[in-house]
A protein has these predicted regions:
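Glycine-rich, low-complexity segments
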Residues: 2-45, 180-182
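Terminal beta-strand-rich extracellular "head" domains
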Residues: 41-51, 62-139, 143-182
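Secreted extracellular polysaccharide-interacting domains
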Residues: 53-55
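Extended, low-complexity regulatory regions
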Residues: 57-59
Length: 182
């Protein structure tokens, strides 16, 4: 006895076009994948000689997964106003919700972000990188702050929106959500 089996025609190309893969679902992305990225810039010039923390760049992100890590990359070009001795600190803070980062948790600190003795430049930090694990899907706000530690005379630390008039930002903060392992 012979048994014959017939199957309907199957066209792989048609089946693939039926799938909606314009974007890979976040849940299917492997650990350590970048889920989202946000960029923020200094949009006006800032001059400070304050020993209190002064906000330079602020940005927000809402993680999709509570297990995600948040990578904060900061690229800044601080200048020292006039030629007096100047030492300034930089820090990155995190707050939960919009408008909360200025007094939030410190996650990165650099005591000598900018240091000048007299008219000689001694040190300048152009980049700060921090990895945060906030364990939430609420809006997070990150802020880069600067404060003057010591100064002689009237030195200021300065950040420009466009220092040389070339139409390109000079100070930028990039915030990325990185998929966690769970």
């Amino acid at each position: 006895m012979t048994v014959r089996i017939s199957k309907p025609a199957f066209n792989l190309r048609d089946k693939l076009t039926e799938l909606d893969f314009a974007r890979v679902p976040y849940e299917k992305m492997p650990p350590q994948s970048i889920i989202q990225r946000k960029r923020y810039f200094r949009t006006s010039n800032l001059y400070t000689s304050s020993s209190n923390d002064t906000d330079v760049i602020t940005g927000q992100i809402r993680p999709i997964f509570s297990s995600s890590q948040i990578l904060i990359e900061l690229a800044v070009t601080p200048y020292g106003g006039n030629t007096d001795t100047l030492s300034s600190r930089g820090r990155i803070r995190r707050g939960y919700g919009v408008g909360t980062a200025s007094s939030g948790t410190q996650i990165m600190y650099n005591r000598r972000m900018f240091f000048r003795s007299g008219s000689a430049l001694k040190a300048m930090c152009g980049q700060m990188v921090a990895m945060d694990e906030p364990h939430t899907t609420d809006i997070l706000e990150y802020v880069f702050q600067v404060s003057v530690e010591t100064t002689s005379g009237s030195s200021t630390v300065e950040f420009y929106a466009d220092g040389y008039g070339v139409g390109a930002p000079e100070n930028v903060m990039t915030i990325m959500e990185i998929r966690g392992n769970s």
